[in-house]
Amino acid sequence: MKLAKLQEFRQAAYKHLGRAHDATFELTDAILLTRNAYSLADLSLSPVFRRKWPSIYEALQDSRPQRQKLMQLYIKQMSTQGRPLLAGDHTAWSRPDAVTLQERTIEHSSVTIAGNKPITIGQGYSTIAWIPEDSGSWALPLRHERITSWENPIQKAAWQLQQVCENLPTRPISVWDSEYGCAPFVLKTSNIKADILSTFAFKSLFMGRTTTIFWQGTTQEAW
């Protein structure tokens, strides 16, 4: 039964990969099965990638995955027991030396650059995932997309949350870190059918230190 379900899922995902779907599908398998890859060309050595190494670059250039349909396919794999727990985050892909890479932006980073500033130059990505278990690190990304130079993390996250919630049968709980504990995110998510839990960091005038509180978005209750 599990094998049949896996085969059904793979066949459905294959249909949503757009152009160059054969090479893209095999590239996906190669990524899953390759423990260490130091370049894209290394993935062409995987036994499941039955093409020559240039096909990897052609697949990435030509493929146009149908993100909405893939998200709907992922949602079908979610448990229907209880309310789904979603987690959103913004991560940086540091590319400070890739001067020819388009759409590089200034991103927050825990590793400082020259001048001891906690930033890097690269690309930012916004992810919203389903967290299915009480313990462990496994999660199912429902949307994972680059934040373009004309967007910001707040706009992207709110849009992604809206897209996910419109396709969920049950009102979810979504959790976010302090980057999203701000008025713009509160306003942009006020009409989304989800209960939002985020941290707010603020300077206490009386204690002179950073404090964290929790806020439930759509009901506007502070805890």
List the predicted regions and their residue ranges:
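A short, flexible helix-boundary coil/loop motif
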Residues: 1-20, 31, 42, 132-148, ...
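Gly/serine-rich nucleotide phosphate-binding loop at the start of the catalytic core
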Residues: 1-61, 65
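A common structural microfeature
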Residues: 28, 37-40, 53, 82-87, ...
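Alpha-helix C-cap/termination motif
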Residues: 34, 46, 80, 167, ...
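Electropositive, glycine- and tryptophan-enriched low-complexity nucleic-acid-binding patches
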Residues: 54-58, 110-171
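Active-site-proximal, Lys/Arg-enriched surface segment
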Residues: 59-135
